[in-house]
Amino acid sequence: AEVAPAPAAAAPAKAPKKKAAAKPKKSGPAVGELAGKAVAASKERSGVSLAALKKSLAAGGYDVEKNNSRVKIAVKSLVTKGTLVETKGTGASGSFKLNKKAVEAKKPAKKAAAPKAKKVAAKKPAAAKKPKKVAAKKAVAAKKSPKKAKKPATPKKAAKSPKKATKAAKPKAAKPKKAAKSPKKVKKPAAAKK
């Protein structure tokens, strides 16, 4: 009877610790991010040991004693992802370095994404300079999807002010008329056959 209450008392003691550990996680960055930054900040060639990593986390205001297991899990996950490379030891005990290849692979991906955005921005001013092309593109867009049908209202406004825009608007206006005439022609022969 004396042995049974001891584990029961230990279980509620563990629960509040977990809750307390969860609270700081919400306010600050994840352990993995902190560990990655700490390893990146170190200048040791052989890599950062787990003890040194814990010290740097503690210096940054992270409670290492409460979240010791989380630090180990975070380090292991960073190694499996390829963010960190293990230079010595196995598992969470050992020395770790930032995987330069993984970091370099991420940077070009970001750079590649940035020029795409620039190209899109570059196309817009070019389109503004050549209203004829814009009108043609908008007409095509209007044919393809009914949602974009609102766009043809904008060239009409532009047609009132500059003369060039009116020239662009006229052929654009003619295209939908041709499209409208062609179905009528198809209907007439059908009526004649009947």
Curated annotation (Swiss-Prot):
Compositionally biased spans, kind Basic residues: 15-26, 116-194
UniProt-annotated location(s): Nucleus; Chromosome
Modified residues (Phosphoserine): S145, S161, S182
Region called Disordered, residue ranges: 1-31, 105-194
Keywords, alphabetical: Acetylation, Chromosome, DNA-binding, Nucleus, Phosphoprotein
GO MF assignments: DNA binding; structural constituent of chromatin
InterPro entries recorded: H1/H5, Histone_H1/H5_H15, WH-like_DNA-bd_sf, WH_DNA-bd_sf
Source superkingdom: Eukaryota
One cellular component (GO) term of this entry: nucleus
N-acetylalanine sites (modified residues): A1
Example GO BP: nucleosome assembly
Compositionally biased region (Low complexity): 1-14
Residue ranges occupied by any H15 domain in the UniProt entry: 27-100
The protein's role, per its UniProt record: Histones H1 are necessary for the condensation of nucleosome chains into higher-order structures.
Family: Belongs to the histone H1/H5 family.
UniProt name for this protein: Histone H1
Organism in which the protein naturally occurs: Salmo trutta (Brown trout)
